[in-house]
């Protein structure tokens, strides 16, 4: 992963339009729009439901606040846009990307855990001779650098007694890595979510998943400046997140039917994948330990130079 762009601009969305939310006890700076990412892969059920059912729009339209979704899936691209003031919330950001961005000076806070899904992150191959991570030695492996998937590769190689230097790692996005695997130009690929399931159904085999290697933590992050100016908006945003999870838990079949159509899987495939995920928002002690381990991984593999205090990255509700 290349270094983050450190341009910090004025936050998008501020205007002179007033807010009619009578619940705020302190006068806050007026706002006309909220900008957040929309990342539906690997299987981000809450985000899909929130967009399809316009849950954020319904919450903030009462105050004439527009909600704009931006389909930016790359962690570095998300954090660069946040730093430039183009985004307010990063809704499904890899823990790796959050830590690297913070270490490079991007002013963000982690609001909550978005998901944990060690089984959802996989190394796949079409090469019958590759049965385990040890068999990857000397092989071409494609995938996105500095991500949870990359962390799975490094951890799997380490467990087998090897390092990344023992493979020919090619940095590319999941769609490109999937195509490269199908074309035979690489021996293995780092793939997640529905794309992985489709590849398996097409004949690819699993070398390993992240289970027992990483927790696969994805987080929701916010611009620190935005959070300081609009703590009421942040609180309401998190309330929508909580209400979304309650709806999904109370109406699982209905929710997963919507999701299956969006991601192009059968309902049975969607249910299978959903069972791999933990979408609970609370940041647990185990999550904090995993984020610390992630930082150690990033520093050890020279993807992060400046160590950060993970506890300082966690947002404190005003």
Language model features with spans:
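A local structural motif
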Residues: 22-34, 59-71, 86-88, 159-171, ...
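Extracytoplasmic "Venus flytrap"
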Residues: 28-52, 146
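Flexible hinge/capping segments at coil-to-helix
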Residues: 24-28, 125-140, 226-231
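Secondary-structure end/capping motifs
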Residues: 41, 228-303
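Pocket-lining segment of extracytoplasmic ligand-binding domains
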Residues: 96, 166-260
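Pocket-flanking alpha-helical
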Residues: 44-50, 70-107, 119-133, 175-180, ...
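Short, low-complexity disordered leader/linker segments with a strong preference
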Residues: 1-33, 318
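Ligand-binding cleft/hinge of the Venus flytrap
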Residues: 49-65, 150-169, 200-201, 257
């Amino acid at each position: 992963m290349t270094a983050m762009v450190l341009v910090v601009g004025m936050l998008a969305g501020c205007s002179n339009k007033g807010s009619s939310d009578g619940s705020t006890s302190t006068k806050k700076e007026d706002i006309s729009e909220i900008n957040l990412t929309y990342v539906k892969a690997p299987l981000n059920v809450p985000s899909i439901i929130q967009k399809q059912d316009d849950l954020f729009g319904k919450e903030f339209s009462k105050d004439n606040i527009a909600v704009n979704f931006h389909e930016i899936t790359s962690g570095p691209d998300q954090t660069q846009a946040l730093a430039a003031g183009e985004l307010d919330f990063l809704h499904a950001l890899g823990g790796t990307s959050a830590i690297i961005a913070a270490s490079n000076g991007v002013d963000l806070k982690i609001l909550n855990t978005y998901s944990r899904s060690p089984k959802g992150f996989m190394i796949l191959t079409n090469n019958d001779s590759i049965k385990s991570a040890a068999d990857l030695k000397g092989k071409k492996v494609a995938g996105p650098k500095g991500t949870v998937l990359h962390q799975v590769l490094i951890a799997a190689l380490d467990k087998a007694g090897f390092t990344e230097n023992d493979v020919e790692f090619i940095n590319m996005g999941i769609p490109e890595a999937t195509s490269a695997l199908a074309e035979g130009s690489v021996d293995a690929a780092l793939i997640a979510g529905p794309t992985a399931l489709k590849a398996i159904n097409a004949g690819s085999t699993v070398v390993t998943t992240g289970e027992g290697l990483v927790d696969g933590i994805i987080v929701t992050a916010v611009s620190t400046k935005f959070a300081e100016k609009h703590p009421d908006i942040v609180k309401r945003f998190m309330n929508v997140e909580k209400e979304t999870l309650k709806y999904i838990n109370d109406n699982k079949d209905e929710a997963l039917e919507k999701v299956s159509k969006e991601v192009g899987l059968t309902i049975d495939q969607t249910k299978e994948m959903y069972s791999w995920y933990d979408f609970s928002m609370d940041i647990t002690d185990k999550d904090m330990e995993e984020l610390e381990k992630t930082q150690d991984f990033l520093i050890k593999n020279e993807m992060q130079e400046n160590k950060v205090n993970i506890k300082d990255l966690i947002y404190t509700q005003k």
